[in-house]
């Protein structure tokens, strides 16, 4: 399930770049290993350097899937530098990606409140 989320995050990020596909160097699937490596590296640093911040994120009332999405958003967007690794102009679109991901979490929580399987 998490691989699907990573692929979708790449597609969302790629679509927010507004760069014609012919001028792109690589496809968005090329970035998936980079994203996974960044998330692993940042999750280790988060657990070592800021246990209270990690605790605050994990203690929110939500499903395990939503907790994972929240952690991904936190790790993905603490600054534009992580996102800029994916593409030089990507940092300009960070706020739009954050809004997109935040909307996804709200949708999942709404579906869960109403008893729908997500």
UniProtKB/Swiss-Prot annotation:
Recorded GO CC terms: membrane
Keywords assigned by UniProt, alphabetized: Membrane, Transmembrane, Transmembrane helix
Membrane topology qualifier: Single-pass membrane protein
Domain of life: Eukaryota
Annotated localization: Membrane
Transmembrane regions: 71-91
Protein name: Putative uncharacterized protein YHR145C
Organism whose genome encodes this protein: Saccharomyces cerevisiae (strain ATCC 204508 / S288c) (Baker's yeast)
């Amino acid at each position: 399930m998490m691989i699907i989320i990573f692929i979708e995050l790449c597609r969302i990020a790629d679509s927010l770049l507004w760069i014609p596909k012919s001028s792109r160097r690589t496809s968005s699937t090329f970035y998936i290993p980079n994203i996974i490596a960044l998330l692993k590296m940042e999750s280790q640093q988060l657990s070592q350097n800021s246990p209270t911040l990690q605790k605050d994120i994990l203690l929110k009332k939500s499903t395990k899937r939503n907790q994972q999405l929240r952690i991904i958003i936190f790790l993905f967007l603490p600054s534009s530098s992580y996102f800029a690794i994916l593409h030089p102009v990507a940092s300009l679109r960070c706020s739009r990606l954050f809004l997109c991901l935040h909307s996804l979490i709200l949708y999942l929580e709404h579906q869960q409140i109403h008893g729908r399987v997500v």
